[in-house]
Amino acid sequence: MIGKRFFQTTSKKIAFAFDIDGVLFRGKKPIAGASDALKLLNRNKIPYILLTNGGGFSERARTEFISSKLDVDVSPLQIIQSHTPYKSLVNKYSRILAVGTPSVRGVAEGYGFQDVVHQTDIVRYNRDIAPFSGLSDEQVMEYSRDIPDLTTKKFDAVLVFNDPHDWAADIQIISDAINSENGMLNTLRNEKSGKPSIPIYFSNQDLLWANPYKLNRFGQGAFRLLVRRLYLELNGEPLQDYTLGKPTKLTYDFAHHVLIDWEKRLSGKIGQSVKQKLPLLGTKPSTSPFHAVFMVGDNPASDIIGAQNYGWNSCLVKTGVYNEGDDLKECKPTLIVNDVFDAVTKTLEKYA
């Protein structure tokens, strides 16, 4: 199978989208068959992208790590992390509060945001703002910057990039921002409303994710639930927020654009050096060259439901969140397979 060649006709062209955690990797360790699966697709010039609700690093750093570990060439133009669609917001907001691990400041600046404040900058400014922060003074000084106009320039939006590590402080700081007077630090608006003072975006809503521990762990979806619950208590109305990542249509539309762009590069229709054109958030491709796209994932609630709702096929693997016998409820994967290599080979045998 590894050496077999597959030929696609113009009218029967297929493509793949792969989750990363629980499909290609478990933690930082590659899952058996992941390398062979991608090599098989590369050899046959079958287009694929990586579509993950993970994040915290630049697309280049993430694909360099994946390429190194799997011994396969993966381009930064092939990956959509949970926060990759934030690139489309660069011209919309001036100052943003970038919430997540310390690395997300660099990610946001790499996207082109001109004025990025990290939540640790606010802890540094006044530790009484976050009395239950778990960060030491040394950590705060390492992660943060001194922002001279922190109290005189308003925030335009809150963008949660990945799962933050200091939830007590981060929830407090986010709550302050979305209940402030027009995005100004140290203020509290008079009215109560479901609409936050400034827009807030969460890059995914995964309640659980799979790491090397045998039981699934809470993810950004759990963090979002806490923010939303506290907002409801303070305002008496549900928070009107924006959520990206799988299974949202916003992210699948964005991913579809990226997949079409990669197919054009792979087939020589555009050069590899041509800058990737970013779609506007919420815009569906007008046409698609694919007869079918297969989403390979381990999480029924994000990968499979997202693909199903979007009109893509799906392959559910047993190497991550999903365990055989779990109640799939409304999920209807096209295939349930052991692992990613199984997903690719069975799909190609049946559809290519």
Curated annotation (Swiss-Prot):
Kindly provide the name given to this protein in its UniProt entry: Mitochondrial hydrolase YKR070W
**In which organism is this protein found?**
Saccharomyces cerevisiae (strain ATCC 204508 / S288c)
Disulfide bridge map: none
What keywords appear on the UniProt entry?
Answer: Hydrolase, Mitochondrion
State the top-level EC class.
Answer: hydrolase
PANTHER family listed in its UniProt record: CDP-DIACYLGLYCEROL--GLYCEROL-3-PHOSPHATE 3-PHOSPHATIDYLTRANSFERASE-RELATED, SUPERFAMILY HYDROLASE, PUTATIVE (AFU_ORTHOLOGUE AFUA_2G02580)-RELATED
| Any single GO CC term annotated in Swiss-Prot or TrEMBL for this entry | mitochondrion
Q: Which Gene3D superfamilies match?
A: HAD superfamily/HAD-like
Record localization = Mitochondrion
Which GO terms are recorded in the biological process aspect for this UniProt protein? Answer: glycerophospholipid biosynthetic process
